[in-house]
Amino acid sequence: MKWLIRIVLIVVVLVVVLAVGGILMIDSIATAAVKHGAEFATQTDVELEGIDVKLFSTEGEIKKLDIKNPNGPFRDKFDSFMILGTGTAQISAGSLMSDTIVIPKVELSNIELSLVGLEGKKNYEVILESLKRFQGDNPPKESEGGKKIVIKELIIRNITVNYYFDADPALGAIAMGPKQIVIADDEPMVLTNVGAGGVPMPQITADIITDIMVQVMANLAGDLGGHMKGLANSLVDTLGTDKLGETLKDLNLGDHVKAIGDLGVDLGEGVGDLLKGVGEGTGDVLKGVGGGLKNLLGGKEEEKKEEE
């Protein structure tokens, strides 16, 4: 009987050791996958403190994902392009063994983003040029392996933007910064069905970064003017007007509609209709808007002449 008890105890200990070892391995695998996905997507250096998968639940915590600025003057100004301070994810347990992992909800907060313009060159142009590889029907073959991911609901809040811009005559923009501004702190950014159908980790990373940058462009169009015109142009080049329109549709544009239009960027017919619809749905906020938004919506600015 004593030998039987000992055997049972040994088996129990082995099961516990294997279970703990498996959890530790899951943490390591998840950390490596997220880090590699961010590095491959942005083609820059990435640091990740780690991912903690809860022992008896399907929740995970992302700890400080740090995407560095491209090497050179941009990194000299701000070391990091984007820092994700905290993130939590709920995972559908039934999908863990399938080819596509379904994540019902991801919440990201305490994000820091740096925007730098030096001598006509922008740090975001370098990053977006890398992310552009994942748009369209022919993403990099290296990103196609492994499991695919879809996020049903993505919530992003508390984005701190650090910026420094030289004067840029081409954009009609004066020198600004270094300064800091916080957005999405009162009303979080909420997106649904990110990575629809399931996409590889690098693609999810690219989608989340561009989503954040669209939010920043929309929120700061009024504050940073011409400098956001440059970002808007880059987003159009990276995403195309259709995908940019889909992202803007999910955002709460509110009072930013006029400022987005005043950038004078050709965001495409679909986005023009979207902004027009937002204006009509919010008490005709487009009345009195300047020529930039009228041109965006396909209209012509009419000058009123005073009769003498």
Task: Describe the residue ranges of each PLM region.
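N-terminal type II signal-anchor transmembrane helix
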Residues: 1-43
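Short low-complexity stretches enriched in small and charged residues
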Residues: 3-5, 13-24, 58-65, 110-118
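Short, solvent-exposed mixed-charge patches
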Residues: 306-308
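Generic alpha-helical scaffold signal
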Residues: 7, 11, 28, 56-59, ...
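A hydrophobic membrane-anchoring feature enriched in long, contiguous, low-charge segments
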Residues: 4-11, 15, 220-231, 235-293
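N-terminal "first-domain core" detector
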Residues: 32, 36-37, 45, 96, ...
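Secondary-structure transition motifs
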Residues: 64-219, 238, 265, 269, ...
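N-terminal leader/targeting pre-sequences
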Residues: 43-70, 157
